[in-house]
């Protein structure tokens, strides 16, 4: 039986990620969340070049230049009686694979929507991913300090496009220059907004009760009447908050505010710690593992190279699923069947590292990795099980990487293999020639690869177009048929970074014809790590 202190530690944990379309304000909201967790004293706004106060979570050189989050940062902070683990995910179009894998390591998501735009393409894609595991979702309608779309319309759009019921928890009073604050439906309180307080925690004036004459005085008679009318309509037409439906991923509580003005973020955080689940069970190939089990298990969902420019290292991010990590404990790496002693695991505050003595289910720890750990690796205290559901996606874009200095072929290969293990890009080595082909989900990834090859491996490379339109991982239980397939299709076959056989098709037509010609061969669009 697990002891009470251990169970208390588990029940305190909340592990969540923020999902949004680029520029909906995700990095800003991350900053403000950390400010409330007292992790940083003054929030640095994400700005273009030239501003020296960069956001805490965008710490890689290229991110600083471009003002976008490229790699997933992990931050832990206390809030109310809980310990919150926040995984910041790249909102930029090109990093969906990294984002996707991060969503396998959380128990809850916060969806940030730009209220002037509504539901955007990237948000739709990410919501599809959360659907695969029915992850509970909280929603923050951002940018109330600008002119926004009608709030009822915004909620309707979320319901119809994302197929999730909305339950408003707070309701906005005006917007743009006329934004006065929000009314908290569950608390029956109005919180008034002050401008110019974005970098600190606001002490909002609170007015109790919707019929309080103080409210009319504070926001003006017209807005007060409008607020009461709107609320009558909203409460009649929207869903009441239902905790079971929220945990099942069927209903989302909706909060309104402005991350830049640091208003409304605390209401969302209050909801998160109150309603989001403590660390959830995870499925393995053998059985389900629950958080309260006493033996340690965990899985690697991301590898980050060179978190410390001073040290040429890589760090594997591991989500603790059950048991407790103790400094110096011996763990079993299931894939390699080797035991390793972990004495220097890290916790993170986006790029600042500190060594950790203990970690509990729901926590994310960093393991130093000298090329022996891969994405999807399971660590246990001896049990031979493997966590499932951490996929690799077939890339959609391909380029050939070419060296400016042909003598650096060895460094190039080393750099590309490391970047592919980290999941930044996928590398394919064709069987028929010495080309190196990289595959990505978005164009920006190629720029990142070239920049990192130069900055971290001192390799000057350029990429050029290549006649590949899609890739599929190939499997066949019949050895003889697989050998025949390989012999006849060598010019279209390659090995990926993990030496898995891959069919690289010049066109979709070619892929479909090959499929018909070889019915015994399986072509997979995703591959479990």
From Swiss-Prot:
GO terms for biological process: regulation of translational termination. GO terms for molecular function: GTP binding; GTPase activity; guanosine tetraphosphate binding; translation release factor activity, codon nonspecific; translation release factor activity, codon specific. Belongs to the TRAFAC class translation factor GTPase superfamily. Classic translation factor GTPase family. PrfC subfamily. This is Peptide chain release factor 3. The keyword Cytoplasm applies. GO terms for cellular component: cytosol. Disulfide bonds: none annotated. GTP binds at residues 20-27, 88-92, 142-145. Pfam families: EF-G_D2, GTP_EFTU, RF3_C. Increases the formation of ribosomal termination complexes and stimulates activities of RF-1 and RF-2. It binds guanine nucleotides and has strong preference for UGA stop codons. It may interact directly with the ribosome. The stimulation of RF-1 and RF-2 is significantly reduced by GTP and GDP, but not by GMP. Keywords: Cytoplasm, GTP-binding, Nucleotide-binding, Protein biosynthesis. It comes from Proteus mirabilis (strain HI4320). PANTHER family: PEPTIDE CHAIN RELEASE FACTOR RF3. HAMAP family: Rel_fac_3. InterPro entries: EF-G-like_DII (IPR053905), EFG_III/V (IPR035647), G_TR_CS (IPR031157), P-loop_NTPase (IPR027417), PrfC (IPR004548), RF3_C (IPR032090), RF3_dom_3_sf (IPR038467), RF3_GTP-bd (IPR041732). Residues 11-280 form the tr-type G domain. It is found in: Cytoplasm. NCBIfam families: prfC (TIGR00503), PRK00741.1 (NF001964), small_GTP (TIGR00231).
